[in-house]
Each structure stands twice: as C-alpha cells, then as structure tokens.
C-alpha cells in the first residue's frame, strides 16, 4: 500500500510500511529558473544550446496536509491508483525546474526512451529530445573508416553523442520505483553516483511509484502512459516478407519462399505508393495513393493473397512530396506546417525537401486520417509502416498557435494517434497492424507496434545488430512492450552492405522476437536478400517456421502486455535479483520462459552466455544447465536459446516439433 505520512518536520512516501522517500523541512531538492534553449536541425539531427539566465533553489519551509510548501509556490501530492502525482503550483514566471532524488552506487537506471548503446544508465546524462538516431556525419565517418581498414565494431561514442527516435521522460530504478514527467519540452536526467538530478524545460507535474516487483511496477507505469492492444492473429503465423519493385517481383519472390515451405503471413511493399531513386538509394514517393504503374493489378493480388492467409502491408508518413497531387491539395487548403514567413515549412530528409501535414489543425488532421482510411485501409492493406515523426522544427508556426518547442516531442505520439484512430474508426482494430519508429509519452497507448529504425547491416555495437537488444529492452522499460527490427538492417550504402553472416544472425534473433519482418534495405542491389540462393531461402524459411511455432506462447505474452503492461521482451532482472542481470543488456527474456542470447560477432561459432539462477534447457541439444556463465556452441540456425525447465507453458514441446 502506498501512503503519504506528514508531521511537522517531514513528509514521507511509504510503501508497504517502509519509508521510501523522505522530504525534510530545510531541504533544497527543488529549484526553478528562467532560460531558453536553441535548436538547430539538420536532417532530423539537432544541435542544442542551453542558456540558463536564473536558477533559484527552493527550500522546503513546511508541510500542509499532502502539500510541500516551498519558499516560492508548492508541490501538491496526490495518490492516484498506485502512483503519486506531484503537481507544482504557484511557480508562474519560471520555465525551468530541477528536482533531486537520492541514489547509491549500486543503483541501476533504465528507460528514458529507446537506447541503443547502453542498458544501465548509471553514470550517464540522458537528454530527452526526439530526433534521428543515426546522422549523416556518423555514417560517413564509419564508411571512411571501413574504406581505409579502420573498422571497429566495438566502437561507441560518448553516450551524449547519440540521439534517438523515441525519447520519454521516464526511468525505472533497480530499487523498484519509477519517475515519469508530464513535461513535453526537453528534459535532462543526470544519473550521478549519489543522486539523480532531473531537469525539465518547463514547470510540469511528475509521477513516482513503488512496487514489490518489476511486473507490478510496469503495470503502474502503463496505467499512466498506456498500453498496446493485442495483435491481430495473423501476425504470429510466420514472417512478413520485405519486398519492393512491383507486382511481378512481389509474387515471384513470395512464390520462392512458399516453394521452400516458408511460413509467410504478410508481404510488406513499402513502395506501393511509388519509388523515388535518389543519390543515397531507393526511397519512396510520399504521395499516399496506389502507384498503378509500378504495381498493376495490386488490388486483385491483395484479395488473392488474403485468401491464402497472406496479408499485404504498405507505408505512410506525415510528410508530403511537393511534386505530387496530395501536396497540391494540402497546400491549397492551408494544411501544412508553416515557417515564420507564412510559407509551407519544407524540411530536407535525405536529398529532397518535403512538406509536413499540420497535425494541430483539426481539418488537416482529419484530412490525412481520411486518406489513410480510404487509400490504405479501404484499398485492402492490412498494415503499414507509419514512419517518422521526429522532424518538427522548433521554429515552426503551428495552426494551434502552440510553441513548437513544446510540441516537437509529442509530434510522433500525435502521428501514431492519427493512425490508431483511422484503424479504430474503420472497425479494423484487431485486424490491422501498423508499426511506428518515433515516439514519446503517449505513444505506448496509441501505437500497435514499434520498430527499431534504420539500423546498419553489420555487427557494430552502436548501430548494428547488437544495438537492437538494448533498444528493445529500453522500450519495454518505457511501456512500449511490442518492438522488432528490420531483418538484416536498413542503412546500406557504399561499403555498408549486408552480407550472409549478419543476415542469418539477424534472422535467428528475429525468429525469437515479437514480430518477424524483413527489409531489402536502402540499396537492395548491394545487399544479400532472402532469395539470393537456395541456402538462404531454406534458412529463412526454417526461421519463419520456428517463429510460427511460437504463436501460442507469443500470444500469451502479448496478452499480458496488453493487460498488465509487461513487455514481451524483458530484461533478466525482472525475475533474477543478480548483479549481472542488472547490467546485461545483450541477452533478453522472450516472455517469462525463453532466454535469448543473439550472436553479435562476425563469423562467430560460439557465444558466452550468462544464465541466471534457475534450471535451463538448451533448445537445440536439450542439455540441462544451472545458473552460471557458459560458452555455448552457436552454429548458424542455433543461436543460444534456453527454456526454463519449470516453464508453465509447453513452449519447449512446440519448438521441438519444428526444429
């Protein structure tokens, strides 16, 4: 039970009879100030300069009922369900706020968004500002290093040098509490040795909650940020093939997989609305209408494939190609985000400019939603990639009149909401699945599935296959319990190209993930594809069958996420109170009973695996293991996967039938 206890000298937050957080008269743990933050955006990457003009520590003077009375203003505490809401009052005139929480050396911190390079954030400084995860400069330097033989797959920049598609002012402590802010402006978390310093660039309420276990803590958090609903039944029935290039190519590649007894539940054709070939690769024409020239008879093929149990998925984002008809309509109606001069604000993504639909304009919001209903859903698509959401410039002029600095972070959640409403208003929730890249608070209750963005097709720690595991785990810690990645990565250009080694290892990992979906990549012609030869066709087909065999198990885990907010991909420390479990970001639990340790090095045939204190059965050999660290054989097709001996599910039997 959560309680607030007050006397003349202190206010304490108590959980199950134990004091967890104590505020004393005279403490200076709050501060307010005035300042401004300047943002410069280049292709979704932000240079941020902070200017603090005033900062005033606020001493606690006294307590009145559940209120913390400060030198200026007060903080009102309200217990709402199992969480405590801290609501600042009387702090008008300030636009920055600081709050300090006590910490200790052994405490771990997790979350703050989708984090690709770290798992435990102790000692780090996290900036909460939605952006592109990988920028042009980083990729260019990497390609040059590869060219001159300086490839270093273990290289990582300082933590603060990385940005992320999904940011959220939320963290989970290993001491079984969470902090979550209602702020929409930038936040900064400093996880120091003896304290955690929280800065928000606005005066905003926040939440703290405690629980006996991490599952209950996630339920408390997702009571605030929301949860994803259960997935359509067809999603579990194998692999969604990533194909592009037209109707004939789509069917040819699909039939190859069928001939190898692959389990195909969908075909994702991102170029259904048209292809734009640029200097960086094969991209898309952002005009959300069927390209009949590239995909003749697609409407008929969709119906034929649906009869075979195969769905067809497309692509959509909140931009508009300025050369195409939908933009002409939008700009004529005043539906685009404006710049300070009143012109449509055109942003450059890679090599071309695009306009943005102003989602704060109710008419524009309904216009793009109706396009999704008519051109995607009514056309017959069973899902789509709902891309982007990170690019709203802070000097934009919005229809609502709101300051874009306070809307920038929430833009991807608003974009997810458009897509979610289109699905629900069409009566298709439970039949259609869209998946999003960018996110913020609000995304967990709007999206149907996350994906981990434009990863590099290699084993690099910061951008390649290894980065996927901490990314999925950190999303789970924010309440987004459904996520997956492009099989083989995406950003292929020049000497960044997908080879057979990384492709097979990515197939293995995604077979043991919530969703199995492929992607041809930015430059398909330089990448290995699933139909390159009979060997990879058979390998990919086998992995799809293994994934399909997980259907009952995954459905149960997804249902738990929908009901309780406990993600499908879970960190080991959820159930094992061991030091290594709190720091291991490169293994994960799929549901409660399966431990997965993807192979993360090129040409590796073994992998060192940490097993928490339990009884485990190695999937491929059925050999039993106790807790400990082992070097496990990992030939292609057999990444280290272990099933709990005392699993309540029959998942081991289901998998053994397939392997």
Show the residue positions of the predicted features.
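Catalytic core of carbohydrate-active enzymes
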Residues: 420-432, 438-452, 471, 475-485, ...
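Short beta-alpha connecting loops at secondary-structure transitions
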Residues: 351-357, 399-408, 450-458, 535-540
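Catalytic and substrate-binding clefts that recognize carbohydrates or anionic sugar/phosphate headgroups
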Residues: 1-232, 242-243, 254-259, 631-653
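Catalytic nucleotidyl-transfer cores of nucleotide-processing enzymes
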Residues: 303, 450-467, 554
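Glycine-rich, histidine-containing beta strand-loop boundary motifs that form or position
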Residues: 15, 72, 79, 86-90, ...
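Alpha-helix-loop-beta-strand connector modules within alpha/beta enzyme cores
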Residues: 408-423
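Aromatic-lined carbohydrate-binding/catalytic grooves of carbohydrate-active enzymes
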Residues: 230-384, 388-401, 444
């Amino acid at each position: 039970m959560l309680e607030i206890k007050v006397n003349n000298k202190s206010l304490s937050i108590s959980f199950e009879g134990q004091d967890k957080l104590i505020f004393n008269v005279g403490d200076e743990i709050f501060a307010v100030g005035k300042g401004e933050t300047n943002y410069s955006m280049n292709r979704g990457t932000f240079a941020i300069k902070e200017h603090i003009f005033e900062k005033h520590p606020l001493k606690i003077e006294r307590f009145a009922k559940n209120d913390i009375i400060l030198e200026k203003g007060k903080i009102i505490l309200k217990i709402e369900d199992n969480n405590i809401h801290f609501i600042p009052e009387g702090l008008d005139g300030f636009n920055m706020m600081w709050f300090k929480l006590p910490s200790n050396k052994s405490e771990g911190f997790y979350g703050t968004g989708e984090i690709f390079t770290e798992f435990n954030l102790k000692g780090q400084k996290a900036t909460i500002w939605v952006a592109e995860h990988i920028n042009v400069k980083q990729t260019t330097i990497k390609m040059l290093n590869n060219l001159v033989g300086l490839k270093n797959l273990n290289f990582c920049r300082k933590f603060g040098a990385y940005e992320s598609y999904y940011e959220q002012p939320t963290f989970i402590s290993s001491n079984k509490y969470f902090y979550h802010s209602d702020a929409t402006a930038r936040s900064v978390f400093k996880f120091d040795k003896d304290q955690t310093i929280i800065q928000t660039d606005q005066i905003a309420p926040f939440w703290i909650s405690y629980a006996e276990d991490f599952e209950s803590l996630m339920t408390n958090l997702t009571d605030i940020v929301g949860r994803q609903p259960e997935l359509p039944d067809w999603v579990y029935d194998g692999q969604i093939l990533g194909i592009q290039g037209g109707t004939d190519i789509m069917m040819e590649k699909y039939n190859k997989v069928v001939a190898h007894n692959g389990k195909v539940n969908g075909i994702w054709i991102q170029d259904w609305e048209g292809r734009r070939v640029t200097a960086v690769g094969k991209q898309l024409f952002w005009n959300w209408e069927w390209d009949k020239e590239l995909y003749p008879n697609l409407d008929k093929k969709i119906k034929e494939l649906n009869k075979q149990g195969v769905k067809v998925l497309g692509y959509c984002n909140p931009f508009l190609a300025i050369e195409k008809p939908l933009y002409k309509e939008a700009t004529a109606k005043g539906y685009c985000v404006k710049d300070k001069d009143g012109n449509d604000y055109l942003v450059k993504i890679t090599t071309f400019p695009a306009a943005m639909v102003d989602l704060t304009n109710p008419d524009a919001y309904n216009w793009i939603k109706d396009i999704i209903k008519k051109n995607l859903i009514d056309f017959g698509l069973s899902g789509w990639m709902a891309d982007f959401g990170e690019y709203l410039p802070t000097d934009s002029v919005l229809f609502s009149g709101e300051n874009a600095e306070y809307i920038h972070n929430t833009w991807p959640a608003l974009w997810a909401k458009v897509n979610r409403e289109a699905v629900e208003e069409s009566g298709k929730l439970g039949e259609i699945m869209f998946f999003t890249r960018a996110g913020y608070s609000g995304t967990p209750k709007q999206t149907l599935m996350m994906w981990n963005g434009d990863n590099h097709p290699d084993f690099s720690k910061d951008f390649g296959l290894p980065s996927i595991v901490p990314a999925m785990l950190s999303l789970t810690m924010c309440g987004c319990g459904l996520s997956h990645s492009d099989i083989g990565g995406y950003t292929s250009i020049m000497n960044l190209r997908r080879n057979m080694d990384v492709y097979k290892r990515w197939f293995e990992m995604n077979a043991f993930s919530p969703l199995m979906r492929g992607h041809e990549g930015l430059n398909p012609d330089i990448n290995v594809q699933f139909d390159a030869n009979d060997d990879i066709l058979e390998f990919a087909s086998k992995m799809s069958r293994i994934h399909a065999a997980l259907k009952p198990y995954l459905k149960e885990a997804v249902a738990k996420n929908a009901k309780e907010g406990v993600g499908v991909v879970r960190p080991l420390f959820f159930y094992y109170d061991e030091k290594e479990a709190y720091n291991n970001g490169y293994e994960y639990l799929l549901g409660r009973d399966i431990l997965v340790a993807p192979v993360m090095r090129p040409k590796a045939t073994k992998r060192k695996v940490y097993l928490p204190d339990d009884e485990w059965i190695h999937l491929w050999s059925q050999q039993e293991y106790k807790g400990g660290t082992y070097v496990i054989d990992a030939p292609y097709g057999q990444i280290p996967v272990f099933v709990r001996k005392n699993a309540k599910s029959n998942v081991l039997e289901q998998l053994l039938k397939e392997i």
